[in-house]
Amino acid sequence: MKRAEILTGLWLLMFLIYGKECMSQIQNKVCDTIPYELVHNKIIIPVTINGVKTKYIVDTGGKTGTMYDIALEMQANAAGYTRISDVNGQGQNYQEAYVSNVSIGNSYQIKLLKTMVLPKDPFFTDLGVAGILGGDAFSQSVVTFDSRYRIMVINYPYRPEKLKLTDGVPLLDETEYNSFITVKQEEQTMKILFDTGAESFLLYSIQDYNRLADISDIKETNHAHGIVSAGLAGLGNPVEIKKLNIPSIRIMDKEFTNIGCTTSVMNETIIGVDLLKYGKVIIDYMRKRFFFLPFEKGKTDMGGAPVLWNVSILPRNERFEITTIWDSMKDQVSFGDQVININGTSLSNCPMSQIAIEEIMNAIPGDTGYIIIKKDNQERKIEIKKER
């Protein structure tokens, strides 16, 4: 009896000494730390699926999708169809399939993951990725994005140390793995989507603009007609685009002021990947919580309306065309005009690539340049400018 009491006492002492430390290690276990590349404002990470080593864009606003040829290589199995809308509001049906033995980083494993089967996309090909990883790929984890070190940290099954459930706000969509949260714009509340697949800080829904324009201090600074961007379903139809200045948006306890943005035809306003410049984002998919830990306290002035070229050019109809025209250019060019030269760079041998065109435009020094358009067998040189 005495021996049993001594052994019990020893076990209790060992638990008191080591138990707390062991529990701490379990609760704060880091499943994996994954360095990411940031290429054309896309977060890209390595992924291995059924022995196929590849890369994916991390897209917290989308569903997992894989290009058809790579899905075949992964020996994907058909799983029906799904319908989604892209950034241009274009709905399209996609076949779905299951892929097996998914490894994200070294330790995070998924036995079976459903993916949309996407057509071959030159944008994905240019980036060297198989497709996009949506929130559904991280449904059994807690994901931290830390832009200071360009890492994603995947915790399982618990949140990072010292992070309480009450430190975050609820994800609004209980049925999907999209990161919808509530933010405050001036005195109004609005539902937004945190979307790492979106390039800028803020992409403002035209529906939210129509709802809030008369009861807030939103200012329209410019206007255009054209295509918002290339989406999964390709180029959208031309729409009216507004350039806006938003006085204030508060994400949890952090206030951003003087925010410039453009409008989109999406149903929801989007906070994009640029949020990561200002703090860590943690998404607890299992408990449906969102955390934003700003690097600096106090207000951050975002500098007002964005400075953009007064025309946009994209590959379209097997050539390069003007796809967005801001008001200062509406009497000089037309939607669909063929562009054959940008500031001295001939496009005759340029690949039909959005990335290639963006690189040429970004290389123009200063705030002015020129394009040469070809129309009715006539070539015309036209000055272009950056403007707010």
Positions of PLM-derived features:
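Bacterial Sec-dependent N-terminal signal peptides
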Residues: M1-N28
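Pepsin/retropepsin-fold aspartyl endopeptidases
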Residues: C22-R388
